[in-house]
């Protein structure tokens, strides 16, 4: 996500309209990248920024919540498809979207087909681990970021300004 939002800042600076679609992360979470890009998007100085949250986060134990998140992920993908067809944005950030594909909530073959056939010169960035090989094969650029060391490994809680 960090690299994707850095790219979004560059796109904003070029005046590109940006659509951010957050999958998996809760709509209740207040994250710094959202606040910053919303302020920049509303400033009138660069491109516009629209922020869409798909679901309320995930749970490892609540099946009802998982089913709701599966539905929200599918609804979110449907919205992305509509926006791609309408060429709504020049840059799409599908944050954590690799997970719904990995978990089987969204059909990878359909995603690959839609991205391959999208009109215009729209750029799509998908974040998240375990990206399906078909998606990796289609991509122009793939980054695999891996943690070497993190304060949480030593028991430190997430830090304001660092993790959010």
Question: Residue locations for each model-derived region?
Answer:
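Short secondary-structure boundary segments
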Residues: 22, 53, 96, 128-129
